[in-house]
Amino acid sequence: MKRTCALASRAVPKSLLERQARRTGSKVGASQEASKFVVASLRDIGSLFSGSSSGDDEEQEALRLHSDTVSKLNSGELTEVVRQRYCVDNKDRCETRMLLTKYPGPAREREMLQVATAELSARDWRKMPRVWQQVSYYHAFGSWGPRTGLSFVGRRPEDFFVTDQKGLWTCSAPRRAEYERSSRALDPASRAVLYAAALVAAVAALGDLWRRQDADRQVTVAELDLAEPTSSPT
């Protein structure tokens, strides 16, 4: 009796039901396929709205980051973070070697520093704390990001000019290599125009050559004497 109850309570395998439906011609399989199609369609429709919602979420996250950064900047909390990270002995001046080794830091800190420097750039430079002046200067002209590898330490850092604006392409080895590479090669638009002009000239020259060699295209020009005949004396 117990064995019979245990067998009755066991669930029927799904594969067995599908085989039975195909064998008996039942519409259960068709209804299952239709329900799967409806679910997939609803999922596709939902994905159309997920893109806009993710964009709204990113915009809200950017606004939240900006508001949080400005709040920490005005309260002085972010200034203390900068001093603890980039200053050693003198709390009013950042150490250059600390900026060279630690800037811009993790992704979250980099985003906050970028928002803070953009916010401070609209304010009076003279009223800006000394540490923020240094961070803003290094953020704009430092050897990080696209200027990685350029020397920043010295009287006249590479890739930045204080008084002399001559010979910009000779300021550093990377700029000189870029200048020489760009001076030897044409840009894509100039190459396209040059190739098109060469193709048109070649087609015109070949057409002229074929016309000269084709006997059917040659004509004989008759020279007519159009001089008026002299009248005989009467």
UniProtKB/Swiss-Prot annotation:
It is a single-pass membrane protein. Keywords: Membrane, Mitochondrion, Transit peptide, Transmembrane, Transmembrane helix. The keyword Phosphoprotein does not apply. It comes from the Eukaryota. The keyword Ligase does not apply. Residues 1-66 form a transit peptide. Belongs to the GEP7 family. Involved in respiratory growth and required for cell survival in the absence of prohibitins. It is found in: Mitochondrion membrane. GO terms for cellular component: mitochondrial membrane. The chain crosses the membrane at residues 192-209. Its main location: mitochondrion. This is Genetic interactor of prohibitin 7, mitochondrial.
